[in-house]
């Protein structure tokens, strides 16, 4: 690692990529009890059985939008790591200001 500066292998050199697991159905990791707890925190008493899949779908779309914006901020700054501030700015852009994470 002599004299390469920022980025280990040197920017643009490529190199061997790690094997990445194929992502499928990770949205099912948001379990029924987890959705139930969120609803309870929001003051819901009874929950229809159809709510769980609908909630997973809505959450997936919301997270995709926030993550897309956060990654855009990260790429613009020529970084490879998404920071908490990238997420804060992404949420602010969507009109959902979040306090307590810097900035």
UniProtKB/Swiss-Prot annotation:
One of its GO terms (cellular component) is nucleus. Transmembrane segments: none annotated. The modification N6-methyllysine is found at residue 21. CDD domains: HFD_H4. SMART domains: H4. Residues 17-21 bind DNA. Keywords: Acetylation, Chromosome, DNA-binding, Methylation, Nucleosome core, Nucleus. It holds the Pfam family CENP-T_C. Gene3D superfamilies: Histone, subunit A. This is Histone H4. It comes from Caenorhabditis elegans.
């Amino acid at each position: 690692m002599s004299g390469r500066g920022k980025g280990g292998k040197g920017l643009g050199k490529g190199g061997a990529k790690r094997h990445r697991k194929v992502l499928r159905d990770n949205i099912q990791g948001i379990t029924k009890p987890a959705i139930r707890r969120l609803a309870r925190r929001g003051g819901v008493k009874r929950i229809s059985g159809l709510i769980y899949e609908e909630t997973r779908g809505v959450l997936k779309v919301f997270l995709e939008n926030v993550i897309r914006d956060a990654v855009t901020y990260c790429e613009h700054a020529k970084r490879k790591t998404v920071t908490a501030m990238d997420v804060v700015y992404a949420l602010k852009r969507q009109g959902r200001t979040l306090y307590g994470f810097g900035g």
